[in-house]
Regions:
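Structured alpha/beta or helical-core interaction and ligand-binding surfaces enriched in interleaved
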Residues: 1-149
Length: 149
């Protein structure tokens, strides 16, 4: 498959649209992971990835290429190092501001997990995946208020 390059920081390759900040070398293979959002609107996904990069939220972001994968849904991944607390806060704030964290019928945020790339490489998906970092470590799931500043 051919690689497609768009603009200065977007690459279309192998079923993904990658959005790069120019600082992706900061990501450490052993510490890197992602917060995820599942979508069904390709245009929205690409715009939100570009917005995340433009606003300095993460170093790298990607979304599924639904045309290539031929799936009705896709995933957005916001990449950062797992030990970078300030970057977790930036990504979580961005996700909350852009309504990318689902809520229960009672209005409580779902306790999403951060997924390390090592877990992805090990094939941890679905019931086999256990998040080591969870949203509840950063915010009160009922109110959305930060647990610590």
């Amino acid at each position: 498959m051919l690689n497609y390059y768009f603009g200065g920081n977007m690459i279309r390759d192998l079923g993904w649209f990658w959005f790069l900040s120019g600082k992706e070398d900061i990501l450490d293979e052993e510490k890197c992971g992602k917060w995820m959002y599942f979508f069904d609107d390709q245009e929205f996904a690409q715009k939100i990835c570009q917005k995340a990069i433009d606003e300095g939220v993460c170093y790298e972001c990607k979304c599924s290429d639904m045309e290539i994968t031929r799936q009705p849904t896709g995933v957005i991944c916001f990449y950062l190092n797992g030990d970078d607390i300030e970057n977790h806060k930036r990504v979580i704030q961005f996700m909350m501001k852009n309504d990318l964290i689902r809520k229960t019928k009672a209005g409580k945020y779902y306790n999403n997990s951060f997924k390390f790339d090592n877990q992805t490489r090990a094939g941890e998906y679905g019931a086999d995946f256990e998040g080591k970092i969870k949203l509840e470590q950063f915010i009160d799931l009922r109110t959305g208020e930060w647990i610590y500043e």
